[in-house]
């Protein structure tokens, strides 16, 4: 890739957790978004569906025509919880962008039937070309008044 030596890479403008997200024509359509705590009855807990809405800002000086955007779920110790990260190959606009401008990349990631073994902190690590650029943290907790899970 022909990147300028002083170029700043892509940055995350928006990253949020939601019940559902669609990315259509440069817009995020979000249902039940912006939460940071997932309440469950007991552990282990299987959550039917959650999503991430993401807007990445890419400077025109980035110099690449493609980038790999990935999201990996990790527990509090940094151990991955998915067999592999979810990834999108993103084609970037050609030379039609004026110099010194940025452009946005809008994407959504949906995760179905995630299993959370225990209460605690989790995070989605967002990476560009296998380099982490952001971390979206959340907690999974038992609802108050629910009996504790056997350990």
Where do the PLM segments sit?
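Contiguous segments within soluble domain cores/interaction surfaces
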Residues: 2-119, 123-128, 132-151
């Amino acid at each position: 890739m022909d990147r300028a030596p002083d170029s700043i890479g892509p940055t995350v403008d928006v990253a949020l957790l939601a019940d559902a997200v669609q990315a259509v024509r440069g817009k995020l359509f979000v249902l039940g978004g912006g939460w940071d705590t997932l309440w469950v009855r007991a552990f282990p807990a299987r959550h039917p569906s959650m999503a991430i809405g993401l807007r990445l800002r890419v400077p025109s000086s980035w110099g690449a025509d493609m980038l790999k955007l990935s999201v990996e779920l990790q527990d509090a110790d940094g151990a991955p919880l998915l067999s592999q990260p979810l990834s999108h190959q993103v084609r970037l606009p050609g030379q039609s962008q004026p110099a010194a401008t940025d452009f946005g990349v809008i994407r959504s990631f949906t995760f179905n039937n995630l299993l959370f073994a225990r209460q605690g902190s989790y995070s989605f690590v967002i990476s560009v070309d296998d380099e982490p650029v952001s971390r979206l943290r959340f907690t999974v907790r038992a609802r108050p008044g629910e009996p504790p899970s056997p350990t």
